[in-house]
Curated annotation (Swiss-Prot):
Disordered as annotated region, ranges: 1-20
GO molecular function: phosphatidylinositol-3-phosphate binding
Entry-linked InterPro entries: PX_dom, PX_dom_sf, PX_Grd19_PX, Sorting_Nexin
Name the record gives this protein: Sorting nexin-3
C-alpha cells in the first residue's frame, strides 16, 4: 500500500522528477558603510516651496520654487532650483500630454478666481503643484523619456514657446 508521501515514484531518488529539499541560508555578508548610508541607486526628489507674489493690481502673480535633487543621468544637474508660475505648469502639462500619449498626466490644482493671493489659497496651490510634480517625476517613462521634464524642473531659462 502506498503512503501519502508516495507520488507514484515521482519524488523517488534517481527519478528524473526528484526534487531535493533546499535549505535557504541567510545572507551573512556585511554591508559596507556606503551601501547602508549612501544614496539610493536612482533617486529623484522634488519639492515645490517658497511662493512669492510679484507685481501690483491686475499684474500680480505668484511663482514657486522647484527644488530638484537627483542622480538620474537624464537630468543634467544633481541639484537645481528654478521658479515657475502656475501658467508655466499649465503649459508644461499640455506639452507632456502631447509628448507622452501613452501616459495619463494628472490634473493640476484648479484655477482660483477669488482671493487668489491669500495665504491659504497660495499654500493650497503650492501643495497641489508639488503633488502633481511628484506624480509626474515618479513615472518611469517620463523620467527617462520626456524631453520637457528635465528642462522644466532644472532649466532657469525654460521657455514654454520652445516646445
Amino acid at each position: 500500500m502506498a503512503s501519502d508521501q508516495d507520488n507514484s515514484g515521482l519524488d523517488a531518488p534517481g527519478s528524473q522528477f526528484h526534487r531535493p529539499i533546499l535549505q535557504s541560508m541567510p545572507d551573512t555578508r556585511q554591508q559596507s558603510f556606503d551601501e547602508i548610508y549612501g544614496p539610493p541607486e536612482n533617486f529623484l526628489e522634488i519639492e515645490v516651496r517658497n511662493p512669492r507674489t510679484h507685481g501690483m493690481g491686475r499684474h500680480m502673480y505668484t511663482d514657486y520654487e522647484i527644488l530638484c535633487r537627483t542622480n538620474i543621468p537624464a537630468f543634467k544637474l544633481r541639484q537645481s532650483s528654478v521658479r515657475r508660475r502656475y501658467s508655466d505648469f499649465e503649459y508644461f502639462r499640455d506639452i507632456l500630454e502631447r509628448e507622452s500619449a501613452r501616459v495619463t498626466i494628472p490634473p493640476l490644482p484648479g484655477k482660483v478666481f477669488t482671493n487668489r493671493f491669500s495665504d491659504d489659497v497660495i499654500e493650497g496651490r503650492r501643495a497641489g503643484l508639488e503633488k502633481f510634480l511628484k506624480i509626474v517625476v515618479g513615472h518611469p517613462l517620463l523620467q527617462t523619456g520626456s524631453k520637457v521634464l528635465a528642462a522644466f524642473v532644472q532649466d532657469p531659462n525654460w521657455d514654454r514657446n520652445a516646445w
